[in-house]
């Protein structure tokens, strides 16, 4: 299980949301990975990403939750807790 946070350079929303996402994952001792969309075009295509920021939760090798552009942090925290 892990969280993937995708952002891009020059995205002010991405920079504002990043510490909030990190706080939630740290608080829940949840594995997380962060990637720059503009540096990983292949991953962007494989994950069907059309906007940033994007948060994707994976559990047992499958995507179980995705939020894009506007992240609901209470929903994200709830979804993470469901997998603990």
Regions of interest found by a model, annotated:
Residues 1-24:
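Local sequence-structure signature of Cys/Sec-based thiol-disulfide redox active-site neighborhoods
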Residues 6-7, 25, 29-43:
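Thiol-based oxidoreductase modules, predominantly thioredoxin-like and allied folds used
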Residues 12-13, 39-42, 71:
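Short alpha-helical
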Residues 40, 52, 64:
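Active-site loop signature of alpha/beta-hydrolase-fold enzymes
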Residues 43-47, 79:
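CheY-like receiver
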Residues 47-56:
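Structural micro-motif
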Residues 57-84:
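Non-catalytic, surface beta->alpha helical segment in thiol-disulfide oxidoreductase systems
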């Amino acid at each position: 299980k892990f969280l993937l946070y995708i952002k891009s350079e020059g995205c002010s929303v991405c920079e504002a949301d990043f510490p909030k996402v990190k706080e939630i994952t740290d608080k829940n001792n949840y594995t997380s990975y962060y990637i720059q969309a503009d540096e990983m075009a292949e991953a962007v295509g494989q994950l069907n990403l059309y906007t940033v920021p994007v948060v994707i939760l994976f559990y047992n090798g499958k995507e179980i939750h995705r939020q894009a552009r506007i992240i609901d942090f209470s929903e994200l925290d709830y979804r993470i807790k469901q997998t603990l």
